[in-house]
Amino acid sequence: MEVVKMSLISRYTTPTHFFTLPFCTDGITELAIIYYQNDNVVLIKNLSDCTRNDTVISVSLTEEETALFKPQGDVKIQLRVGIGEKRMNSKVLRVTVYDVLKDGLLSEISGGDAP
């Protein structure tokens, strides 16, 4: 299974990741998108977290979820799908994590000048 498109991860943002598959996604019965960094599974998104459109699976991350990633070390991402009894995995993708100058949700830090 080949994943064609992937966006980057920046901490405290709300990215949407797109996975283009070589088949229609309608038949997918199980799905896990695993985000792995520094020898730990950081986040798993499931089928209920995703949107399907023809051959594309998309998943959005929240500010809280991207805050879980460390600014040091790439994140590895793998898509695993099940269609009935069949199981498939994508290649492991590596994306760079971009840091922020000030930690915190935007709504918490945008109230004026920070000390």
Please place each PLM-identified region on the residue numbering.
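Contiguous segments within soluble domain cores/interaction surfaces
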Residues: 1-115
